[in-house]
């Protein structure tokens, strides 16, 4: 039996020695001047550049984030208690790269790609730079392909398209994350790859979100990138960029990708913390001067690529938190100006029991109807008009004004539409079911039913269609248009449905 050293035969070791290059190497090294709060000041790293990865003698990695005449500021990807003053720091000349690939789907990882769900090792398909240039104008296509959230109020009134950036903002505990999670759940039927980036979120919240995605069958096409409040600032800082880099990998393979940043307010606070520790000059609200660039550079990477580049798309849903409903503060206004629209969640509506608590008046999608199928455009235009008229006329009711029959009818129609826009958490609805729902509302089919019963009527009618006339739903799903044939069938089937389910349509309470 041949003698072995370090698990290798002697012959193999001798071959390795012959292959080894013993010529001198020039390496740039420095020494730790000070360390604390996840940041180290390193001297003598004269050739360092911003974004460069350095390795400490203790094995901790860091990234250069500021340059001074006599030192460089490094943020640490590990605990700073393992780094000591005077410790040697080695320059690598490389930028940060993260692993990515289909093996990460269904897993919970940290921003560096390390699994934190106890599920074993992940074998990456590639390593991609965290910081990439956004696709140029010539590499993009207009946003036209709809991304269905499964939420009626959004798909009808604030449509989102693949490649768009739509901000979700509102006060704490108003349902921002719920909208994002429902959108991810809705993508399980459309083959969209989803990435959920949790920035400084509680472990209990992450566990609940992962469990929800698993229960609704959406975890298998989702990567969860999680950072916690007690993580080093460096991990919280790079989390959205790492998630974006992973999403870009799939986008360039022609895939449709949805990424959620939850939330960029916490990310801005992390960057402010890091910048102050690095002694950068503070600006408005003590944020560093390049905070706008940081977020715009991140969100500009979302795109719908041209066909010559594979036609993939990366859609971004950044989340921002407001304070006392004030959307004119620094970070929210920055993000509103960067994105292609916003969904504003109103605390007053939330407290009144409206779910989702979307303030339609302050919400907008700058892509608009171009990201809606024809069938949805057919019903959404009338829907907006009826809803706007209802809110205008409803003001007169507060003063006890007597109204004519036509106005009263519009108010009653508006009440039913408003009721149909309410939707519970995780109750996502397919686009064909939404089109039928709003067609019934616009067409007056629900006018004879009490407001509190209209949702129940629609649910029963769609169940009736699935049971007896599934071909109508299939045809609408394929055409995504309310053709004369489909409209004729909807009318006839609804009359039949009323006869069978409600013996006396004129007295539906019976």
Curated annotation (Swiss-Prot):
Q: What Pfam families would the database entry show?
A: ATP-synt_ab, ATP-synt_ab_C, ATP-synt_ab_N
Q: Name one GO cellular component term.
A: plasma membrane
Q: Do you know which InterPro entries this protein is assigned to?
A: ATP_synth_asu-like_sf, ATP_synth_asu_C, ATP_synth_asu_C_sf, ATP_synth_F1_a_nt-bd_dom, ATP_synth_F1_asu, ATPase_a/bsu_AS, ATPase_F1/V1/A1_a/bsu_N, ATPase_F1/V1/A1_a/bsu_N_sf
For the protein in the UniProt heading, the enzyme class is translocase
How would you describe this protein's topology in the membrane?
Peripheral membrane protein
Residues under site feature: Required for activity: 363
List UniProt keywords, sorted A-Z.
ATP synthesis, ATP-binding, Cell inner membrane, Cell membrane, CF(1), Hydrogen ion transport, Ion transport, Membrane, Nucleotide-binding, Translocase, Transport
The answer, when asked if Cell inner membrane is one of the entry's keywords, is yes
Spell out the subcellular localization from the entry: Cell inner membrane
Reaction catalyzed = ATP + H2O + 4 H(+)(in) = ADP + phosphate + 5 H(+)(out)
Report the superkingdom from the record: Bacteria
Q: What is its EC number?
A: 7.1.2.2
- Please state which protein family the record places this protein in: Belongs to the ATPase alpha/beta chains family.
Checking HAMAP family in the record gives:
ATP_synth_alpha_bact
What this chain does, per the entry, is described as: Produces ATP from ADP in the presence of a proton gradient across the membrane. The alpha chain is a regulatory subunit.
Q: How does it assemble?
A: F-type ATPases have 2 components, CF(1) - the catalytic core - and CF(0) - the membrane proton channel. CF(1) has five subunits: alpha(3), beta(3), gamma(1), delta(1), epsilon(1). CF(0) has three main subunits: a(1), b(2) and c(9-12). The alpha and beta chains form an alternating ring which encloses part of the gamma chain. CF(1) is attached to CF(0) by a central stalk formed by the gamma and epsilon chains, while a peripheral stalk is formed by the delta and b chains.
Q: Per its record, how is this protein called by name?
A: ATP synthase subunit alpha
Species this protein is from: Dictyoglomus thermophilum (strain ATCC 35947 / DSM 3960 / H-6-12)
